[in-house]
């Protein structure tokens, strides 16, 4: 659960710093954002999985706290994140950069390839 909070905190801090200095056409493609298109949402998912794991370890059975993951994950994956991506792709100044980014980086859950990409850094692209 703590790991999830830290991932979300770092992703949100990077997003705030990017938003303060971005130019038209820019896409955030640094740090955690090189491994996941929505690492702040990944952090929330990790928080709920960790919370469910704590409940399992403490009580030996899944209980209603596990619903947090489902109630967060399902709307995120089916509605919120696709809408955010559609808005990004509809911005004429950044559509080319975003489509390239979208092709290279998974929606939420990092893959081995996206993790390797994150460690290589932007200069390797």
Model-derived segments and spans:
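Hydrophobic transmembrane alpha-helices
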Residues: 1-14, 19-125
